[in-house]
Design a protein with these regions (language model features):
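A helix-centric hydrophobic-segment signal that preferentially recognizes long
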Residues: 9-210
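Extreme N-terminal basic, low-complexity initiation segments
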Residues: 2-8
Length: 210
């Protein structure tokens, strides 16, 4: 009986080994595929963050010329101008790069600084309605067109960033992505707060035609 059982035992052992090898191959393929998907979405978040920062910088670059143009009108409210300059300086004090959004404290500070800047610009534009001569200024009108474009691009870029982060953060909480994220050190990304998400749904209106 021993001589007959040996071939049968060897057959099942070979089957077991083949099955284990196939299982390991499948697990390996799944893990590699999961890693590639996480890496892809991580890069999408980085790209979205980079685009958002670029659009914020474009708006920031418009402010000095806007302030200098408005300063030419002596009766213009100086406090409003000071608020804009101060808000711009607050943004400039933060070390900005795409890794910024991986630090919740820095991201919150940067988000608040940008929100404050947007609000101060809105007040500046609202008060400008009182000054027909300022609104008729060609340079001012050109700056308004550029600012309107900047605000629209910021709104789009922020929306894309929020969606990219949502997708990434959801993915790394799901199996088997969560295992890969832990092993490879992929952490949760910082997203905008609910308050800011509501704010971006309404693009600031820049209108000098009235």
């Amino acid at each position: 009986h021993r001589t007959k059982s040996s071939p049968i035992k060897g057959y099942f052992m070979r089957k077991l080994v083949v099955g284990l090898v196939l299982l390991l191959i499948i697990i390996f393929v799944v893990l590699i595929n999961s890693y590639n998907k996480i890496q892809k979405n991580d890069e999408l978040v980085t790209a979205a963050a980079s685009e958002l920062l670029n659009q914020y910088q474009r708006r920031l670059d418009l402010i000095p010329n806007l302030v200098n143009t408005v300063k030419g009108y002596s009766n213009y409210e100086s406090q409003v101008l000071q608020d804009v300059v101060k808000a711009r300086a607050s943004v400039g004090q933060i070390n900005v790069n795409t890794r910024l959004f991986e630090n919740s404290t820095l991201a919150t500070s940067y988000q608040k600084a940008q929100d404050d800047l947007g609000k101060s610009l809105s007040r500046l534009l609202a008060i400008s309605e009182r000054y027909p001569d300022l609104k008729a200024n060609t340079l001012y009108q050109d700056l308004m067109v550029q600012l309107e474009g900047a605000e629209n691009r910021i709104s789009v870029a922020r929306g894309r960033y929020i969606e990219a982060v949502r997708h990434y953060n959801t993915q790394i909480r799901q199996f088997p992505y969560n295992f890969i994220a832990i092993v490879m050190g992929y952490d949760k990304k910082v997203n905008f707060t609910v308050e800011s998400e509501q704010e971006i749904k309404v693009t600031p209106v820049v209108d000098f035609a009235s």
